[in-house]
């Protein structure tokens, strides 16, 4: 994912479930990219998980992660603080947004420059108890336009249904 993000020219969209890796590495990983492009983050809504324990329990079982709602809550808190710090910095050239969604997560996705001919995405599908071994696909708009457009349309549904937390 990071290598793809490094190729971005104008913007990066990152869709994840718990976003734990990104939350741990945000200050190193995203700070450099924010010098060149804007970044948009989408993750599960931690409040929704806390208030919908059955749903959270299903996701806990699906991902094989104990206390999944708490795990998402901690990642969200960390990412929110990072976004606020970055956006409040008067020297920050590009902004970062953070939005949450409640739809069942089926994949994580990183999309760079979706409105250009050089657009590209990496899609990682979640399967039951998959751990770190997940099917991963790199899709270039120039080579497989229909597939790229189809998957990006799927992502746009999520973008439109999400709730902006940091604008």
Named regions from a protein language model:
Residues 35-37, 92-96, 119:
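Short glycine-/polar-rich loops that comprise or flank the Walker A/P-loop
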Residues 4-6, 33, 90, 101, ...:
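A generic structural signal for short, solvent-exposed coil/turn residues
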Residues 52-107:
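HKD-type phospholipase D/PLD-like phosphodiesterase module
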Residues 122-167:
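Signature of lipid phosphatidyltransferase scaffolds
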